[in-house]
């Protein structure tokens, strides 16, 4: 009896949001944020195909920068730079240049190149860690016997 009541209550709870949303006039497919339509804001969304996939925060400019290229070895002339001291590797960032507290859209003369430290990692091989774990377990089992 209690199970039947619990199932009935669950079904009613699942149906309630669907029934209530039919009476609302706004269509979920047509909902947009205000800044997506305002042409005066730098936060206006652009075509997703044109937006770079990888963005990182640059503490120097305080803005989101785009990653350019891969993690590379620092040349000997830059080994003393702050971004090369930690790991010996660097990655290029394309950051907006701030002038008069205005964030500009991307263009050649309004962007600046910065670097950040990175660590050169081997390509991920998820199966190797699992095999090492299992070999360790097998070794422990054999030692116990």
UniProtKB/Swiss-Prot annotation:
Coiled-coil intervals: none
Compartments reported by the entry: Secreted; Host nucleus; Host cytoplasm
Major localisation: secreted
Entry superkingdom: Eukaryota
Leader sequence segment: 1-20
GO cellular component: extracellular region; host cell cytoplasm; host cell nucleus
Sorted UniProt keywords: Host cytoplasm, Host nucleus, Secreted, Signal, Virulence
Motif annotated as RxLR, chain positions: 31-34
Keyword Chaperone assigned: no
Task performed by this protein: Secreted effector that completely suppresses the host cell death induced by cell death-inducing proteins.
Family listed: Belongs to the RxLR effector family.
UniProt domain comment: Has the canonical translocation RxLR motif, but lacks the canonical EER motif, which characterizes most oomycete effectors identified so far.
Record protein name field: Secreted RxLR effector protein 43
Species name: Plasmopara viticola
GN (gene name): RXLR43
């Amino acid at each position: 009896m209690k199970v039947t009541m619990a199932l009935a209550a669950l079904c009613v709870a699942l149906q309630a949001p669907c029934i209530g949303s039919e009476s609302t006039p706004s269509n979920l497919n047509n909902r947009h944020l205000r800044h997506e339509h305002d042409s005066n804001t730098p936060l206006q969304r652009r075509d997703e195909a044109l937006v770079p996939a990888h963005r990182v925060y640059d503490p120097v400019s305080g803005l989101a920068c785009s990653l350019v290229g891969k993690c590379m070895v620092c040349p000997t002339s830059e080994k003393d730079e702050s971004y090369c001291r930690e790991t010996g590797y660097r990655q290029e960032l394309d950051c907006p240049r701030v002038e008069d507290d205005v964030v500009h859209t991307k263009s050649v003369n309004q962007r600046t190149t910065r670097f950040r430290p990175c660590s050169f990692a081997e390509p991920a091989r998820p199966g190797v860690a699992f095999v090492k774990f299992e070999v360790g377990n097998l070794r422990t089992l054999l030692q116990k016997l």
